[in-house]
Amino acid sequence: MAVAPARARSDYDYLIKLLLIGDSGVGKSCLLLRFSDDTFTTSFITTIGIDFKIRTVELDGKRIKLQIWDTAGQERFRTITTAYYRGAMGILLVYDVTDESSFNNIRNWMKNIEQHASDSVNKILVGNKADMDESKRAVPTSKGQALADEYGIKFFETSAKTNQNVEQVFLSIAKDIKQRLTESDTKAEPQGIKITKQDANKASSSSTNEKSACCSYV
């Protein structure tokens, strides 16, 4: 079950953890850097293990702190990656539109999600490097959309190089997660517990400690 977002900090209302997964070389790190720092580099360095960036955005008047984890795509690092599935509230499955094998492997990554992530985790399919010449494209847009439809998830084609749809894909999944969490909170509200005045005092004194603890999965 997804961990509830921390809301006790002064600089944000929600803390949402996102995970970027996909084969090595599909551009996960480039997407992350473009979204977090608005930078792009042609020099490619393979991610070793796990790295993350943070960016705070505003959605519907709420400050959303996005903690975005970039994972290594190599087989030998998948055991490291699986430990980070559990706390993820949203997962971006990334493939390279010029590399058909990276697209075909999305099904394997989806199996990993089903095995290790929360049942309620939000997912989105991302076809990266959409700026490449059509002669180099190996995966048609229609094929990506068909796979997304099969899984019942949203689909975007992006380019970290030109910044095509990068902002949109991250904000889209963040908005869907916020909506899910808000609906979950609303449903939980009627399930109150009657407490005595003594219990209330105890709860009040302990709430500060609880609120100061950020998400345990960070």
From Swiss-Prot:
A lipid is attached at C214, C215 (S-geranylgeranyl cysteine). It comes from the Eukaryota. It is a lipid-anchor. Residues 182-218 are annotated as: Disordered. One of its GO terms (molecular function) is GTP binding. It holds the Pfam family Ras. Residues 201-211 have a biased composition (Polar residues). GTP binds at residues 22-29, 70-74, 128-131, 159-160. Keywords: Cell membrane, Golgi apparatus, GTP-binding, Lipoprotein, Membrane, Nucleotide-binding, Prenylation, Protein transport, Transport. One of its GO terms (biological process) is protein transport. It is found in: Golgi apparatus membrane; Cell membrane. PROSITE patterns: RAB. Its main location: Golgi. GO terms for cellular component: cytosol; Golgi membrane; plasma membrane. A motif (Effector region) lies at residues 44-52. SUPFAM superfamilies: P-loop containing nucleoside triphosphate hydrolases. Belongs to the small GTPase superfamily. Rab family. Involved in membrane trafficking from the Golgi to the plasma membrane. Interacts with PI5K2. This is Ras-related protein RABE1e. The gene is RABE1E.
